C-alpha cells in the first residue's frame, strides 16, 4: 500500500506539479512531506499526516518549516516495569 501511495504522489510531482506555479507555503513541499510521512509512519498514519498538512496549505496559513514528526518507538522497558509493579 505504501508503494501505491508514494507512486501516486510521484506521478503528481512528475506530471502535474512541475507544470504549475510553485504555490506550496511549506518546506518541505506538501508532496515531499507526504512521501516522507508515508515512508516513516506507514500508509495509514502517513496519509493522515499528509492530508493534515495539505489542509493547512492555503493563503491564510503562514506556512514555513514543517517537518514530518519522528516515529515514536515503543519502549519495551517501560512496559516491562509496569507489569512488574502491578499488584493482583
From Swiss-Prot:
Keyword line: Cell membrane, Membrane
The UniProt entry, under InterPro entries, shows:
Membr_insert_effic_factor_YidD
Question: Does the keyword Cell membrane belong to this entry?
Answer: yes
**Superkingdom, according to UniProt?**
Bacteria
> Cellular location of this protein?
Cell membrane
Q: Which Pfam families match?
A: YidD
Listed GO cellular component terms? plasma membrane
Q: What is its main location?
A: membrane
In the bilayer, the protein is annotated as:
Peripheral membrane protein
Q: Where is the composition biased (Basic and acidic residues)?
A: 69-82
Record region (Disordered): 66-88
Report the protein's function: Could be involved in insertion of integral membrane proteins into the membrane.
- Which family is this protein grouped under? Belongs to the UPF0161 family.
The family database entries (PANTHER family) matched by this protein are listed as: MEMBRANE PROTEIN INSERTION EFFICIENCY FACTOR-RELATED
Q: What is this protein called?
A: Putative membrane protein insertion efficiency factor
